[in-house]
Amino acid sequence: MKEQVIERLIRYAKIDTQSDFTSETTPSTPKQFDLLHVLKDELATIGLTDITLDENGYLFATLEANTDKDVPTIGFLAHVDTTTDFTGTNVNPQRLDNYDGGDIQLNENLVMSPADFPELQNYIGQTLITTDGTTLLGADDKAGIAEIITAMEYLIQNPSIKHGKLRVAFTPDEEIGRGPHKFDVAAFGADYAYTMDGGPLGELQYESFNAAGVKVITKGTSVHPGSAKNKMVNAITMAIAFQNEMPTEAVPEKTEGYEGFIHLMGFKGAIEHAELSYIVRDHDRQKFEEKKQLMQAAAAKIQAQFGEDALSITIEDQYYNMGEKIEPVKEIVDIAREAMEKLDITPITLPIRGGTDGSQLSYMGLPTPNIFAGGENMHGKFEYVSAETMEKATQVIIEIVQLFEQRAK
């Protein structure tokens, strides 16, 4: 299994599938279809059926049940796109067998050191797949894709392992928050699902942020600075005044665990026009609403000083804490936990400081916790993944489907 997941990850990683948050199409980039077509053919080759790929880039497939028991239909999902944060063009994965715990020379100018990334010490003796230091790797989430396909292939080759009906989905645009926007839950037809989109060994996540995006626009009046007194209105100054109303401690670089934040993601401005882009995140729904109210109050304060038309604020909720929808069917988390424990994996059930496709899918009627895929240092040139962790993730999938079958009547 180890060599299969390595081969698949490296092959998938070389296909550029970066999404684009400025695009209004689905998928946001046509090149995501380059991998989707490869995966569609591969699913057919290994023996899955009912394979569909729609015009929006959603690839579904089925492994039919091989038991007479009434087992829930279980789905496994991963996304094909890579982040907009770092280039995914010309990815050249490097294989490092039997890692010795020392520095890793990614290229002649770049070293990945345990001094900077101490978690490397967890992987001594293992096979690591790294970047060449010029791109991301794309283990987020091509490791998840490799694990799901390898697990399905293993189940097909070992029919003595009993399971209910299984559904597979590979989806676009997760990295820009639009993965489930055109996901047809009814057509997918699963009772429960799991995303294989987590990080290190043992991650099992069923709580995510509540999330919103905020755009603030300020409008000023440009006048020659030599004659600007009582005439110029500076949009940049207004934008700064708004930002100064934001909490200084509730920011990503100062928070962890269940602590939420207001994050200024982007700023651009001139005298006449300035824009601020924020994301708001909190696991607690009440605190989430309070953060949005704080921003509305800051906007009202600036408007009172400069005029109502001088500032506009748009707040759009993006997704909610999936824990609210998973808690009533907590047994799906318990089964994943038991699957890990049977494989001597210690489950790590920390809240996701982010969101997955499962965050939205859970609110669309498909409860979907998140399981580790193995990636470390994702979204950058120091990204890597352990082949042994990918193999374990594949085994977790196989254990989960067996446990569902064993519990059924």
Curated annotation (Swiss-Prot):
Zn(2+) 2 binds at residues 140, 175, 379. One of its GO terms (biological process) is proteolysis. Its EC number is 3.4.11.4. GO terms for molecular function: metallopeptidase activity; tripeptide aminopeptidase activity; zinc ion binding. This is Peptidase T. Its main location: cytoplasm. InterPro entries: ArgE/DapE_CS (IPR001261), Bact_exopeptidase_dim_dom (IPR036264), Peptidase_M20 (IPR002933), Peptidase_M20_dimer (IPR011650), Peptidase_M20B (IPR010161). The active site is at residues 81, 174. It comes from Lysinibacillus sphaericus (strain C3-41). Cleaves the N-terminal amino acid of tripeptides.
